[in-house]
UniProtKB/Swiss-Prot annotation:
GO terms for cellular component: chloroplast; mitochondrial large ribosomal subunit. Residues 222-269 are annotated as: Disordered. It comes from the Eukaryota. PANTHER family: LARGE RIBOSOMAL SUBUNIT PROTEIN UL2M, RIBOSOMAL PROTEIN L2. The lineage of its organism: Eukaryota, Viridiplantae, Chlorophyta, core chlorophytes, Chlorophyceae. It comes from Chlamydomonas reinhardtii (Chlamydomonas smithii). This is Large ribosomal subunit protein uL2c. GO terms for molecular function: RNA binding; rRNA binding; structural constituent of ribosome; transferase activity. The keyword Iron does not apply.
Amino acid sequence: MGIRFLQAYTPGTRNRSVSDFSELTDKNSTPEKALTVSLHRAKGRNNRGIITCRHRGGGHKRLYRQIDFRRDKIGVTAKVVRIEYDPNRNARIALLRYEDGEKRYIIHPRGLNIGDIIQSDLNAPILIGNSLPLRNIPLGAEVHNVEFQPGSGGQLARSAGAMVEILAKEGNFVTIRLPSKEIRLVSKNCWATVGQVGNIEAYNLTIGKAGRTRWLGKRPTVRGSVMNPVDHPHGGGEGRAPIGRSRPVTPWGRPALGQLTRKPKKYSNTLIVKKRKK
């Protein structure tokens, strides 16, 4: 992937950068129709139309591409047909055609090219795009799309540039380092895909203007200190007044900005060797 920096023709293009989409097979191609479904987004509302999650709404209409996170066609090889853009994630997706004719989408790993042959197998070779259990992947290998529980489908390291490093194997568990630098244990029977997720420069893009964020379906975030007291606990006062409390709180009065939100006795605490860096 490359980044294209726009000239300051208008205030909206000043300091703005976009992807050049050079890794895509065809910039004007349409997605595989059998693998797409309509996407109804709730825009942060519940069944009564009341806002339950703020700062959501609008955005461009999208089709959802059904991604194969399980990689459960064991022993059947597949050929990479094309690499496509997916508006629902910052990673690219790759269209596979299996030997039996079935087509599926997967997250595109960095270095996977059109025409490559990949597979999912218990003893698949350690090649980019192949999927196999963690117990059969050597130490130090970089993987993505890692399962939390055997058979649950990949849940870890699916965004652009993400990868998980295998550190150790002991008993029924494998020690891994997550993108957040958290070190934790997962079952050795969990499956993962070899390689790092592509589009590694996605986080170097500069949005450039507010409207581009609205295209993504994100609405503005208003500070509580500029609201009225009826709208937020931080609101009110004369001029630029402080929040007037011993600590920051949410619009509903719960502690915020530094308050730990993870349950202290959560069952998975015993599997975390080292907490993530904040």
